[in-house]
């Protein structure tokens, strides 16, 4: 005995539609019969839309976006470390100058060198954060 739903749906329709829903578009086009006119016939694939992108799920894209933001945030932490380093360098300059004012020129040149290195690391961290956000 067949149910009422099985009487109205032919097996050919079930095969055509479920195969199009389960298989990727590229596999369906590669296994389709070749037309004699060399023109692709889209009437054989009623439920498929030709797309030129990877078939990723919404959950996968959300995970990728969250990972991108987490990575950019972790790279931005280095900018705060750069600020702490600059504060330490100039704090040491003030302490050193207070202890021995005659070494003012040498202490200042070392402070500028420390500032430049610390600032370069901060800018490098910021550059990596922007690369993660906008280049990936």
UniProtKB/Swiss-Prot annotation:
The record marks 119 as: Reversibly protonated during proton transport. GO terms for biological process: proton motive force-driven ATP synthesis; proton transmembrane transport. One of its GO terms (cellular component) is proton-transporting ATP synthase complex. It catalyses: H(+)(in) = H(+)(out). Its main location: mitochondrion. InterPro entries: ATP_synth_F0_csu, ATP_synth_F0_csu_DDCD_BS, ATP_synth_F0_csu_sf, ATPase_proteolipid_c-like_dom, F/V-ATP_Csub_sf. It comes from the Eukaryota. Residues 1-61 form a transit peptide. Belongs to the ATPase C chain family. There are three genes which encode the mitochondrial ATP synthase proteolipid and they specify precursors with different import sequences but identical mature proteins. Is the major protein stored in the storage bodies of animals or humans affected with ceroid lipofuscinosis (Batten disease). Homooctamer; the c-ring consists of eight c subunits forming a circle, and each subunit adopts a hairpin shape. Component of the ATP synthase complex composed at least of ATP5F1A/subunit alpha, ATP5F1B/subunit beta, ATP5MC1/subunit c (homooctomer), MT-ATP6/subunit a, MT-ATP8/subunit 8, ATP5ME/subunit e, ATP5MF/subunit f, ATP5MG/subunit g, ATP5MK/subunit k, ATP5MJ/subunit j, ATP5F1C/subunit gamma, ATP5F1D/subunit delta, ATP5F1E/subunit epsilon, ATP5PF/subunit F6, ATP5PB/subunit b, ATP5PD/subunit d, ATP5PO/subunit OSCP. Subunit c, of the mitochondrial membrane ATP synthase complex (F(1)F(0) ATP synthase or Complex V) that produces ATP from ADP in the presence of a proton gradient across the membrane which is generated by electron transport complexes of the respiratory chain. ATP synthase complex consist of a soluble F(1) head domain - the catalytic core - and a membrane F(1) domain - the membrane proton channel. These two domains are linked by a central stalk rotating inside the F(1) region and a stationary peripheral stalk. This is ATP synthase F(0) complex subunit C1, mitochondrial.
């Amino acid at each position: 005995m067949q149910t009422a739903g099985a009487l109205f749906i032919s097996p050919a329709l079930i095969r055509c539609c479920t195969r199009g829903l389960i298989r990727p578009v590229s596999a369906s086009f590669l296994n389709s019969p070749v037309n004699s006119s060399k023109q692709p016939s889209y009437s054989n694939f009623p439920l498929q839309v030709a797309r030129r992108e990877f078939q990723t799920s919404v959950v996968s894209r959300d995970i990728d976006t969250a990972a991108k933001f987490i990575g950019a945030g972790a790279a931005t932490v280095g900018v705060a470390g750069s600020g702490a380093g600059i504060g330490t360098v100039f704090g040491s300059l003030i302490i050193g100058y207070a202890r021995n004012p005659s070494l003012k020129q040498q202490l200042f040149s070392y402070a500028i060198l420390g500032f430049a290195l610390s600032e370069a690391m901060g800018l490098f961290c910021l550059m990596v954060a922007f690369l993660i956000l906008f280049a990936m």
